[in-house]
Amino acid sequence: MPTCSLPSRVKGSRPTRLNRYLESAGRWQEILDPALTVDKPHYRFNLAGREPFTLDGKEQVGMLYGHWTATNQCIFYVEDEDVAVGDHMVIGRGIGYQQTLGSELAAAGLDVDPKALYLKKSQIMMLWPYDDQCRLLGEDVWEFDTAEAGLFKLDPADVLTVAQSRKLLDPFIKPLPPFDDSLLPK
């Protein structure tokens, strides 16, 4: 089976961490660079309390990233995460937190202030498959256990903006080295 040597690339340059930093810094366009992501990525989401949905292609993925960035919903983090790395995928499981618009939570049927921003807590599982050149094929994201779920209304002074996040994360965002074609099967 061909391998992209993802374990060694993850150890040296951490592509999934780079994607997270770029996303939370509002620099999502860089995630869709052809060196990092295939031309037609496929994203699947199964979020508690919502209908599952998919995104096909960079245009749809970019629309979601763009919306999250414009509304400060691209700010998220994961704690207590376990990560497994294989030849063609990275899997993470942990407790995720994401700033989320009250209006979107209300549209999903939750009794919240639609004008507020919330910090949403959930148990999540994420899978990032990669091709032979270590380019992202997409994402699968599941909120799998509502027992640990939480929703915290944020005081406007506690909302982290994309500009603030970018200032904090930019020093940690380093470009990946070029893909080494010698890793491809002969």
Please describe what each predicted stretch is.
Residues 8, 56-57, 161:
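Secondary-structure junction/capping motif
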Residues 20, 56-60, 120:
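Soluble or luminal CAZymes and related metallo-dependent hydrolases
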Residues 1-5, 72-75, 79-186:
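A beta-strand edge to alpha-helix "cap/lid" segment located at domain peripheries
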Residues 20, 49-53, 112, 116:
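Conserved aromatic-histidine-acidic binding/catalytic patches
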Residues 17-19, 32, 36-38, 64, ...:
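Broad hydrophobic/π-residue packing in well-ordered secondary structure
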Residues 1-30, 34, 181-186:
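Short, low-complexity N-terminal intrinsically disordered segments enriched in polar/charged residues
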Residues 26-104:
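A solvent-exposed, acidic/Ser-Thr-rich amphipathic alpha-helical stretch
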